[in-house]
């Protein structure tokens, strides 16, 4: 059997998520959260995140196949619409005739983070809404972060009557690379008895003056 917990700590202008897990048999553990963000705010309908400006601290990403499973390749972002090493809006290249964006119907890919050292809490991504000036920074101890641009949102109704059409939210899901058990060269995600899985992800918020 296995046991897992996650602790949410709300601070001034920040949300910290701490994950822990133990097991009595070897098991794969790759925890994350699927929080959706729109820094422009919600409405009916909620606007797309196409104008959000994103930076991701990653030189490589994991390409996917036609059913969104990683192929096992680790590919350079350089020279492709996947490159967010310098700030770009989400919408700038999301509709390019690039096979990876076609497979994902937009961005739905794991970025291989440039880590200072294994397990260090580093800045993974920054997201900014230029109209409101709201900024979100994502820090994590994980090796990767999945960028998802709400490609399959279909107009469902959320809190306060807000509706969410396609691409009206963005996710930064800190995690080990998806499908790691089937890709031996990906970072190991197997938890052994006697060990404890630990992960920290921090979302920091600010408003540009």
What are these regions (language model features)?
Residues 43-101:
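A conserved active-site cap/scaffold subdomain adjacent to cofactor or substrate pockets
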Residues 1-8:
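Short, small-residue-biased leader/transition segments that mark boundaries at the very start
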Residues 6, 15-23:
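Short, well-ordered beta-strand segments enriched in hydrophobic/aromatic residues
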Residues 79-209:
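Active-site pocket scaffolds in enzymes
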Residues 20-26, 57-61:
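Short, solvent-exposed aromatic-acidic interface loops
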């Amino acid at each position: 059997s296995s046991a897992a917990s996650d602790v949410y700590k709300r601070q001034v202008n920040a949300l910290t998520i701490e994950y822990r897990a133990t097991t009595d048999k070897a098991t794969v553990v790759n925890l994350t959260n699927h929080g959706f963000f729109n820094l422009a705010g919600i409405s009916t309908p909620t606007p797309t995140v196409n104008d959000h400006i994103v930076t991701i601290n990653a030189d490589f990403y994991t390409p996917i196949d036609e059913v969104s499973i990683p192929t096992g390749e680790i590919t350079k972002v350089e020279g492709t619409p996947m490159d967010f090493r310098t700030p770009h809006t989400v919408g700038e290249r999301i509709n390019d005739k690039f096979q990876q964006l076609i497979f994902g119907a937009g961005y739905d890919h794991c970025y291989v983070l440039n880590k200072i050292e294994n397990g260090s809490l580093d800045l993974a991504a920054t997201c900014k809404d230029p109209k409101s000036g709201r900024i979100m920074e994502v820090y994590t101890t994980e090796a990767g972060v999945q960028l998802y641009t709400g490609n399959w949102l279909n107009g469902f109704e959320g809190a306060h009557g807000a509706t969410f059409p396609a691409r009206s939210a963005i996710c930064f899901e800190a995690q080990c690379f998806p499908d790691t058990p089937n890709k031996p060269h990906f970072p190991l995600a197997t938890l052994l008895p006697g060990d404890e899985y630990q992960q920290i992800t921090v979302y920091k918020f600010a408003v540009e003056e």
